[in-house]
Amino acid sequence: MSKKNPGDPRVKKNAFVHKLYTMLHDPALSHLIWWTNRNGEQNTFALCPGKEFADCLTQYFKHGNVASFVRQLHMYGFHKVSDPLPITYPPNGNNNNNNNNKEVPPVWEFKHSSGRFKRGDETSLVYIKRRSSSNHTSGSTIYAEPIYNPLLTNPYNQPQFMYQDYSMGPPVEVQQFYNYQNQPLMYYQQPPGQVPPPPPPSLPPHQQPEMALQYHQYNNYQQPPPAPPAPPPQPGNVLFGYQQVAPPQQPGSTVQQIPANAPPTLDQTQPLSYTPQLEYQQQQYPQPPLPPPPPQLQLQTSPGIPKVNDNLSRPSPNEQHLQFRKIWPDENNEANSKPRNPSLMFDPLLRVNSEGSPKTQPNHSVSLLNNEVRSESSTSSSSTTVTSTALPPPSAIDRSVSLVGGSPFDLSSRMNNQQSFNRTPSISTPPTQNGRLPKISSPLIPSNTESQSPTMVTGTDNDVGVTSKGSTSIISVSKKPSVFSNSLQERLRPSMFEYHPIGNNLSKDVLTIPKISTNSNSGSRTTSQSSMSSASALSSKKSSLSSISSTHGNLSILNSTNYRSTSVGGSGSGPFSTSTSTSTTSPTLSSLLHHPQHEPQNSTIANGTSIRSSISSSQSISSPPLTTTTTTTTTDQRQLSNSPISRQQQQQPNNNTNKKVSVTSLLLPSHSQSQGYAQPLYKSSVIAEEENSTTSSGGGYRSKSDDDTDNMNK
């Protein structure tokens, strides 16, 4: 008991061993744990595992678990003594109790493997230490035998056994081969239980080194790039002879030629290093070698590639009749050609020669800037035909003045918009043919209008052309500022009225040329090919109030539009002034052609048909004198409230900054309007100016300039 004190300072070094030694020398625990005498040496101790011993453990440790205490004994090198020897109980222990309770489980006896844990030898406790996880040599053989596994200590054993399973032969040559290469054999990264079953024993003997070569080459494929040097040829070793075969084939054919008796793990990942061994198989087996597939594929595909190229480069005879719509014009079939709708975002003053519309230019294309009347123009001017095809009208664009065919707006609400137009009976239209629209003509020379869709062109039912013996001219009320370009894009060009908002009152001057003979048999006919304004009774393929030419044959004047023409009585040969009154509507500007002195007749315009309004008498009217009339266009904006475009138009202020002036108006004196000045011929284009106080919204008003020009003519 006196030896307990010297052992106290060493408790911190290995606490468990010193606590165990203290428990063995504690008299209060002598009946639970004590020293035993085995073979005359007191190097063993016994304990009685139970609840009482578990309660005593809490006095020395942080737990009361007997199993944990036994586990700590094993960690420090103690093990059970399994010899069936009689256990000596402590001398002062409860022998009576032990004798009475014979059915108690036997005690556990422990001994240290080194023998240093003895009774009375406390100095030797410093040598007893806890074993680490790597140092298991000090343990008993029960725990040491699974650790010293020969498969783990010798890295060549397990791959060597796997090779024996594959090749069914002795592994001596393989072992020498690895030693010669001086490289350790890589393991297959699969547990040994997943090794496939060995092939049947009828395998020929030459397959054994072959499998060895496969395995070695697979390992070299997994290893880093520095490969071992090629071994010198040895006559006794067959493995090196296999590596010196002809160059390998391409990998595509070698993978397919692996024999069925090869291991599946090698078939799953076949590197390029298997190709020498595969060639050796082809040499060994008597079956004829298969030709390499990649050259066959090249031979099969090589004739096909130039065939595809020939088909691409050499068009088929049916390619001329393709089923897609061409964007270029077809000279052979002009009626079916569909020119593309050109972009509206182009320079309006730039001359564009569109290839999308076939052009038949007239020989009498005269500018608006002519300062004298060319009355020598022949009435037999060449009739220009324009192939009109279905173009989608850009009605979604905010056009201030446009009679776009198929407009989605309700035109019946804008019937009351008026436009008074006074002119002499010098208008007749030639026959129409196949829905073709004429090219624009000069202000001095008439043009033969040919159309089937509603254009506001007055003509006869019998389609009698203008038959004037003398100098005849039809003034085109609707002229663009530039008539130099007669292409489809010029017809789609925005007019001056679309670039600026329109005021309440628009005034335009119309000048007619004397000696116009008109043969009218049964009235006037209104047809349209392009979106024309109500002032398009004069032959013009362009619209002054509308710049969008809808060549689809859309109706500019829809179902609720009334066409009114005055009844002309008798035939006159003197200075006789005849005027027609027409009431049309457009999506944003309503034009009423109304004469102030006559009562109009109403006729409903049908959609998609030739619109005809009868004139009461068929007559031959000749008006020798020159009659200059002033047309006043009045727009009642209260009637435009139903149109979203007109509502936007009403919101725009009528400022002087938005003044609409044509190019030709710059050549006239500024006081010509107020003085009743007879406008020259190039003033015949429609000019929208400031709001004039002399104009009014009533249809029966006649301006001062009208009276002056009539007096001058008389």
UniProtKB/Swiss-Prot annotation:
Its BP terms in the Gene Ontology are:
cellular response to neutral pH; filamentous growth; filamentous growth of a population of unicellular organisms; filamentous growth of a population of unicellular organisms in response to biotic stimulus; filamentous growth of a population of unicellular organisms in response to neutral pH; flocculation; negative regulation of filamentous growth of a population of unicellular organisms; negative regulation of flocculation
Q: Where do Pro residues bias regions lie?
A: 193-207, 223-235, 286-296
| InterPro entries according to UniProt | HSF_DNA-bd (IPR000232), WH-like_DNA-bd_sf (IPR036388), WH_DNA-bd_sf (IPR036390)
One GO molecular-function annotation for this sequence? Answer: DNA-binding transcription activator activity
Specify the DNA-binding region ranges.
Answer: 15-134
Where is composition skewed (Polar residues) in this entry? 266-275, 310-321, 354-372, 413-435, 444-461, 599-608
Pfam families associated with the record = HSF_DNA-bind
Q: What induces it?
A: Induced at high temperature and during human oral epithelium infection.
Question: What does gene deletion cause?
Answer: Fails to undergo filamentation under a range of hypha-inducing conditions and attenuates the virulence towards reconstituted human oral epithelium and in a mouse model of gastrointestinal colonization and dissemination.
- One cellular component GO annotation, for this chain's record? nuclear chromosome
The Basic and acidic residues compositionally biased stretches are 703-714
**Do you know which PROSITE patterns this protein is assigned to?**
HSF_DOMAIN
Residue ranges for the region (Disordered) are: 187-467, 565-658, 670-714
Q: Where in the cell is it found?
A: Nucleus
Q: Keywords on this record?
A: Activator, DNA-binding, Nucleus, Transcription, Transcription regulation, Virulence
Q: Where is the composition biased (Low complexity)?
A: 276-285, 376-389, 574-591, 609-641, 648-658
**What's this chain's function?**
Transcription factor that plays a role of activator of filamentous growth and which is involved in invasive growth at a high temperature. Required for human oral epithelium colonization and damage. Promotes filamentous growth in EFG1- and FLO8-dependent manners. Antagonizes functions of SFL1.
Please state which protein family the record places this protein in: Belongs to the HSF family.
What's this protein's name? Transcription factor SFL2
User: Source species, please?
Assistant: Candida albicans (strain SC5314 / ATCC MYA-2876)
Cite the source lineage: Eukaryota, Fungi, Dikarya, Ascomycota, Saccharomycotina
